[in-house]
Amino acid sequence: MTVIKIGGSVGINLDFICADVAALTKEGKQIIVMHGAGNEANALGDKLGHPAKHVTSPQGYTSRYTDRATLEIFVMAACGKINTFLVERLQKLGVNAIGLSGVDGRLLVGARKDAIRIVENGKQRILRDDYTGRVEKVNADLLRALLERGYVPVVAPLAISYQGDAINVDGDRAAAMIAGALGAEQLIILTNVPGLLRAFPDESSLIAHIDKQRVEASVDFAEGRMKKKVLGATEALALGVRQVIFADGRVEQPLRRAMEGKGTVID
């Protein structure tokens, strides 16, 4: 089984990815798709007069501050547009895809971070009324039931809190939790670069292989959102996933290329 995380950044080619998913499922491979929505949510927030606010933690990780209005915008982008049209693309290719968010059937459950600590202008401060969290439980039985019936789950990066609130979660880390819960052999994280770069944005500085014992040290090379991807890779490996690959989502046959070792392979 392979879990695929499609990044939400500009440049990723969904047609190439969906064509590859269709080809692989026809060969009998079990695939679960998790997708992001960052760029689409940013654009929608700008149109609605509520632009996204990205914040940085004291540890250097960037995330979206999600008040209730931002959560509503994110749901519109992630579930209303990206998830629906990803499923549409796959259905046109003969894949019986089914769209879900982590809220559906309590697929992804986690603790809501009502307040978050950020660094702003060199000083730490607390932001409250935040609707973000971290996935702690996966309804693996639901995903297995769908896979056994021939569906390809396409999951939007939302979860439900223990109190029943919808929460925005990091898609890379959520994909890692899904991969671990289902005993997936591979987690492929598709981005708008060839993989982890030693000197971003120089694409010729691609790091082709990282030993899984040294993956945490590779966060030093990660810039921006790539830091969360490295964290997700670390968590997936700790949960027993055999291999994590950061691969280029802009090219044709991105999944096959990743499976052939193109990108950054961590094992």
Over which residues does each language-model region extend?
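C-terminal catalytic "cap/lid" subdomain
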Residues: 1-267
